[in-house]
Amino acid sequence: MKKVLITGCSGLVGTYLIKKFLKNNYELHSQKFQIIGVDNNDIKIDVVYTGFTFEKVDLTQNDVISNLLEKYQPDLVINAFGIKGSPIKAKEQPVDFLYPSFKINTEIIDQCFKRNIWLVFMSSVGVYAPSDKFVEDDVWKTLPSENDWFPSWSKRMGELLLEAYKIQYGYNRWSIIRPANIFGAYDNFGEGSTVIASTIKKICDSNDTITCWGDGSPTRDFVFGEDVANAVFEMYDRQINDTVNFGSGEEITIKSMVDNLIELSGKNLNVIWDTTKPNGDMKRQMDITKQEKYNLLPKISFKDALNKTLLYYTSKISNNDLNFEVYKFLDKGFYVGKTDEIIGSDKTEFFDKIDSLVSLSQTKDNYAYRLDYRIPNETVNRYPFYVFGDDIAKRDEYIKSKNGEIGQRWWEIYTKETTSSEIINELQDLKEYFRKITLEYVKKIYPKLNETNIQHHDNFTLYENGDFIEPHRDGYNKGRYCVVLIYLSYEKNYNDGGGRIFINDYGFDENVLPINENFCILDFTSNNPIHSVEPVKNDFKRFTYLNFIYNKNETEKQDDK
């Protein structure tokens, strides 16, 4: 197993780098990695995963970097350390921007050279002087912009030091990436933050008017942190020993960015442009010729990336939790395994009520066949969860397991909390149990599902807040929606005392901000299954994409059918 050490792992790009590894089950092109994250700040993700080690250290202290590399012996170092902030903040606190970066960059480069470790060095758009387009080879012909004067010199000197080691010692085990204006979910949203982060905070804090600096006419090349992380991995994987810009290929005005965020927020806000404040550089646009040559182009659209960033911040300020009420089906009275018999409710009326709530809905005639596992149930427990690779976990367990020693797997603990005597043995190993549920077996349970339905149903993809998913389904569930909550649920069946463990994601078509502010209660027993205020209405969707029915007798009956 290889090891990667990420400095600056609590920063915007550093967090995406960690999550990229976790999302790929610690793999990069089939190669397993152990991840070591180091920073002088706490990490921004709220779990500690198996295979991930975090050390909170002051990287500016003597011998800290040397000791870390000696301790972990990494195959790859990604230097994502950087200090982000507005041009005003950089001018007012130049030492805070220049000294830490300069010292850390110098030490990391020297230690990676001495150990012959591959280094990905994250530079910055700030190294360039103002011009119509930023070309890699033009950096050393001019001086940096005065708006990035101090931060840019630390990055420039890091690049120059790598070139020096290459010339004098032949050290060429490095890549330099120069991202454009980076933004994303794990940015700093306080005072003095970068333009997108500060605009999001203003929008969320206001109900009528926001004030933005300048006149809105300057243009920027914005890139999403997740795309930057993907490019970093590609540069290492392909051993690109070069300095490469990473831009979007788009030129976006500040005004357009603000307008997009207001639209996504669902708010009706006035914008005051304060022309007494500086515009900053009028244009920042990366030349992406070399980037295209290496096929390192972004994959996430600007608007989708804004939406994900906005959703992260709105979830953060509401304590990362939407107020979902536990739902019940106590009055439905369905018979287990019956296709046609429904007691206690008019069939048509009831199906109309649940049409937008039951996942994998192909035809109404097929509902009853599945309702024994989906409808006459009560949610007993519910936990937010993450799926990465083949593992699923409650956050609490991984927080308690800082060294990656989980102890019991989550379902072993979970079944002790519920009714472990009724859980079949196969659940002791989730992956093995899932392999036993072949496509043919799933088809027996859900006979009208087609191939694409089942492929979506049995995947292990991590869906996060703000992700957009386009399931390959027909009917109500067809289309594009935004995930706002994913949870693990245990249900018991009132008819036979059995139950199931399943995973759902909740998503909406509409703007994310009103959903976070307004969505309040799910109650399937009322006439209107969604209780919320405008504009959410009935745009709620639920998809079950991992489902374990563990009533052994009933699953055997299904097998016999």
Locations of regions flagged by a protein language model:
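Non-heme Fe(II)/2-oxoglutarate
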Residues: 321-442
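Conserved Rossmann-fold NAD(P)-dependent oxidoreductase catalytic core, especially the SDR/UDP-sugar
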Residues: 106-148, 175
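N-terminal Rossmann NAD(P)H-binding glycine-rich loop of SDR-like oxidoreductase domains
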Residues: 2-26
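C-terminal substrate-binding subdomain of Rossmann-fold SDR/epimerase-dehydratase oxidoreductases
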Residues: 205-318
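Catalytic core of Fe(II)/2-oxoglutarate
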Residues: 467, 477-480, 489-561
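NAD(P)H-binding glycine-rich loop region in Rossmannoid oxidoreductase-like domains
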Residues: 59-100
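Flexible, glycine-rich beta-alpha linker
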Residues: 128-129, 149-150, 177-196, 219
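Active-site Tyr-X1-5-Lys
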Residues: 146-175, 201-206
